Amino acid sequence: MKTIEQKIEQCRKWQKAARERAIARQREKLADPVWRESQYQKMRDTLDRRIAKQKERPPASKTRKSAVKIKSRGLKGRTPTAEERRIANALGALPCIACYMHGVISNEVSLHHIAGRTAPGCHKKQLPLCRWHHQHAAPAEVREKYPWLVPVHADGVVGGKKEFTLLNKSEMELLADAYEMANIMH
Protein backbone atom coordinates (compact mmCIF):
# COMPACT_ATOMS: atom_id res chain seq x y z
CA MET A 1 0.00 0.00 0.00
CA LYS A 2 1.36 3.43 -0.98
CA THR A 3 1.84 6.19 1.52
CA ILE A 4 0.48 9.66 0.90
CA GLU A 5 3.98 10.92 0.05
CA GLN A 6 4.39 8.17 -2.55
CA LYS A 7 1.01 8.99 -4.08
CA ILE A 8 1.90 12.68 -4.23
CA GLU A 9 5.26 11.86 -5.83
CA GLN A 10 3.56 9.58 -8.40
CA CYS A 11 1.05 12.33 -9.19
CA ARG A 12 3.89 14.82 -9.67
CA LYS A 13 5.65 12.41 -12.05
CA TRP A 14 2.45 12.01 -14.10
CA GLN A 15 1.99 15.77 -14.23
CA LYS A 16 5.60 16.29 -15.30
CA ALA A 17 5.30 13.65 -18.02
CA ALA A 18 2.03 15.17 -19.27
CA ARG A 19 3.61 18.63 -19.31
CA GLU A 20 6.63 17.35 -21.25
CA ARG A 21 4.36 15.59 -23.78
CA ALA A 22 2.34 18.79 -24.26
CA ILE A 23 5.51 20.84 -24.78
CA ALA A 24 6.83 18.29 -27.29
CA ARG A 25 3.53 18.36 -29.24
CA GLN A 26 3.58 22.17 -29.29
CA ARG A 27 7.20 22.28 -30.51
CA GLU A 28 6.43 19.71 -33.19
CA LYS A 29 3.43 21.75 -34.34
CA LEU A 30 5.45 25.00 -34.41
CA ALA A 31 8.19 23.31 -36.46
CA ASP A 32 5.68 22.07 -39.07
CA PRO A 33 5.74 24.51 -42.06
CA VAL A 34 2.25 23.46 -43.22
CA TRP A 35 0.71 24.32 -39.84
CA ARG A 36 2.56 27.66 -39.69
CA GLU A 37 1.39 28.58 -43.20
CA SER A 38 -2.21 27.73 -42.27
CA GLN A 39 -1.95 30.01 -39.22
CA TYR A 40 -0.56 32.87 -41.33
CA GLN A 41 -3.37 32.37 -43.87
CA LYS A 42 -5.97 32.37 -41.08
CA MET A 43 -4.53 35.65 -39.77
CA ARG A 44 -4.56 37.23 -43.25
CA ASP A 45 -8.19 36.13 -43.82
CA THR A 46 -9.22 37.65 -40.48
CA LEU A 47 -7.54 40.96 -41.36
CA ASP A 48 -9.16 40.98 -44.81
CA ARG A 49 -12.62 40.42 -43.27
CA ARG A 50 -12.03 43.19 -40.73
CA ILE A 51 -10.93 45.66 -43.44
CA ALA A 52 -13.91 44.76 -45.65
CA LYS A 53 -16.28 45.26 -42.73
CA GLN A 54 -14.79 48.70 -42.03
CA LYS A 55 -15.19 49.71 -45.67
CA GLU A 56 -18.88 48.71 -45.62
CA ARG A 57 -19.55 50.80 -42.54
CA PRO A 58 -20.82 54.35 -43.17
CA PRO A 59 -18.36 57.12 -42.30
CA ALA A 60 -18.61 58.57 -38.82
CA SER A 61 -20.19 61.98 -38.44
CA LYS A 62 -17.80 64.90 -38.51
CA THR A 63 -19.04 66.55 -35.30
CA ARG A 64 -17.63 65.17 -32.10
CA LYS A 65 -19.10 65.77 -28.73
CA SER A 66 -16.73 67.13 -26.14
CA ALA A 67 -16.15 65.01 -23.09
CA VAL A 68 -18.40 65.87 -20.17
CA LYS A 69 -16.46 66.48 -17.00
CA ILE A 70 -17.56 64.26 -14.14
CA LYS A 71 -18.72 66.44 -11.28
CA SER A 72 -19.14 63.80 -8.60
CA ARG A 73 -17.30 60.64 -7.63
CA GLY A 74 -20.49 59.26 -6.12
CA LEU A 75 -19.98 57.03 -3.11
CA LYS A 76 -16.22 56.81 -3.61
CA GLY A 77 -15.48 60.05 -1.77
CA ARG A 78 -12.39 62.09 -2.41
CA THR A 79 -8.85 60.84 -2.94
CA PRO A 80 -6.88 60.57 0.33
CA THR A 81 -3.86 62.80 0.89
CA ALA A 82 -0.43 61.26 1.47
CA GLU A 83 -0.76 61.70 5.24
CA GLU A 84 -4.27 60.20 5.24
CA ARG A 85 -2.99 57.25 3.19
CA ARG A 86 -0.12 56.71 5.68
CA ILE A 87 -2.57 56.73 8.60
CA ALA A 88 -5.02 54.44 6.78
CA ASN A 89 -2.21 51.95 6.03
CA ALA A 90 -1.17 51.94 9.70
CA LEU A 91 -4.78 51.43 10.85
CA GLY A 92 -5.38 48.73 8.23
CA ALA A 93 -2.47 46.71 9.63
CA LEU A 94 -4.22 46.45 13.03
CA PRO A 95 -6.68 43.71 14.02
CA CYS A 96 -10.38 44.53 14.41
CA ILE A 97 -10.36 47.14 17.18
CA ALA A 98 -13.79 46.15 18.54
CA CYS A 99 -12.87 42.44 18.72
CA TYR A 100 -9.50 43.31 20.27
CA MET A 101 -11.30 45.22 23.02
CA HIS A 102 -13.04 41.92 23.95
CA GLY A 103 -9.83 39.85 23.78
CA VAL A 104 -10.39 38.36 20.31
CA ILE A 105 -7.98 38.97 17.42
CA SER A 106 -9.50 39.24 13.92
CA ASN A 107 -6.85 40.16 11.36
CA GLU A 108 -9.10 40.42 8.30
CA VAL A 109 -10.43 43.99 8.48
CA SER A 110 -11.97 46.71 6.36
CA LEU A 111 -11.69 50.38 7.25
CA HIS A 112 -14.89 52.06 8.47
CA HIS A 113 -15.06 55.83 7.86
CA ILE A 114 -16.41 57.58 10.95
CA ALA A 115 -16.92 61.02 9.37
CA GLY A 116 -17.92 60.27 5.77
CA ARG A 117 -15.56 60.20 2.81
CA THR A 118 -15.49 63.78 1.54
CA ALA A 119 -14.93 66.03 4.58
CA PRO A 120 -11.45 67.41 5.30
CA GLY A 121 -9.48 64.84 7.33
CA CYS A 122 -12.18 62.19 6.88
CA HIS A 123 -9.67 59.52 5.86
CA LYS A 124 -7.83 60.03 9.17
CA LYS A 125 -10.95 58.93 11.04
CA GLN A 126 -11.22 55.26 10.09
CA LEU A 127 -11.68 52.19 12.28
CA PRO A 128 -10.24 48.76 11.43
CA LEU A 129 -13.30 46.50 11.79
CA CYS A 130 -13.93 42.86 10.91
CA ARG A 131 -16.86 42.02 8.63
CA TRP A 132 -19.11 41.22 11.61
CA HIS A 133 -18.40 44.58 13.25
CA HIS A 134 -18.46 46.59 10.02
CA GLN A 135 -21.56 45.79 7.99
CA HIS A 136 -22.61 42.14 8.06
CA ALA A 137 -24.48 40.61 10.99
CA ALA A 138 -22.87 37.47 12.37
CA PRO A 139 -25.03 34.32 12.32
CA ALA A 140 -27.42 34.05 15.29
CA GLU A 141 -25.53 31.14 16.89
CA VAL A 142 -22.30 33.17 16.79
CA ARG A 143 -24.05 36.23 18.28
CA GLU A 144 -25.34 34.04 21.14
CA LYS A 145 -21.74 33.17 22.02
CA TYR A 146 -20.42 36.71 21.38
CA PRO A 147 -23.30 39.16 22.06
CA TRP A 148 -21.03 42.16 21.40
CA LEU A 149 -20.52 41.06 17.76
CA VAL A 150 -22.93 43.51 16.06
CA PRO A 151 -22.21 45.62 12.95
CA VAL A 152 -21.87 49.40 13.08
CA HIS A 153 -23.95 49.56 9.87
CA ALA A 154 -27.29 47.91 10.62
CA ASP A 155 -27.88 44.64 8.78
CA GLY A 156 -31.64 44.23 8.83
CA VAL A 157 -32.74 44.52 12.46
CA VAL A 158 -29.28 43.66 13.84
CA GLY A 159 -26.75 46.34 14.74
CA GLY A 160 -26.53 50.03 14.04
CA LYS A 161 -24.40 52.77 15.61
CA LYS A 162 -26.44 52.94 18.83
CA GLU A 163 -26.32 49.19 19.55
CA PHE A 164 -22.66 49.01 18.45
CA THR A 165 -21.75 51.82 20.89
CA LEU A 166 -23.69 50.23 23.76
CA LEU A 167 -22.00 46.84 23.34
CA ASN A 168 -18.49 48.10 22.51
CA LYS A 169 -17.28 51.71 22.83
CA SER A 170 -18.05 54.89 20.95
CA GLU A 171 -16.40 55.21 17.55
CA MET A 172 -14.18 58.07 18.78
CA GLU A 173 -13.01 56.03 21.80
CA LEU A 174 -12.20 53.10 19.52
CA LEU A 175 -10.39 55.50 17.16
CA ALA A 176 -8.27 56.78 20.06
CA ASP A 177 -7.44 53.17 21.01
CA ALA A 178 -6.54 52.36 17.39
CA TYR A 179 -4.29 55.44 17.12
CA GLU A 180 -2.56 54.39 20.33
CA MET A 181 -2.03 50.82 19.07
CA ALA A 182 -0.66 52.08 15.73
CA ASN A 183 1.56 54.71 17.44
CA ILE A 184 -0.10 57.52 15.50
CA MET A 185 0.11 60.96 17.06
CA HIS A 186 -3.10 62.97 16.78
Curated annotation (Swiss-Prot):
Gene3D superfamilies: 3.30.40.190. GO terms for molecular function: enzyme activator activity. It holds the Pfam family RecA_dep_nuc. GO terms for biological process: DNA recombination; DNA repair. Residues 62-76 have a biased composition (Basic residues). Residues 45-59 have a biased composition (Basic and acidic residues). This is Recombination enhancement function protein. It comes from the Viruses. Stimulates microhomologous recombination. Enhances the recA-dependent precise excision of an IS1 element inserted within the E.coli galT gene. InterPro entries: RecA_dep_nuc. The keyword ATP-binding does not apply. Residues 45-81 are annotated as: Disordered. Keywords: DNA excision, DNA recombination.
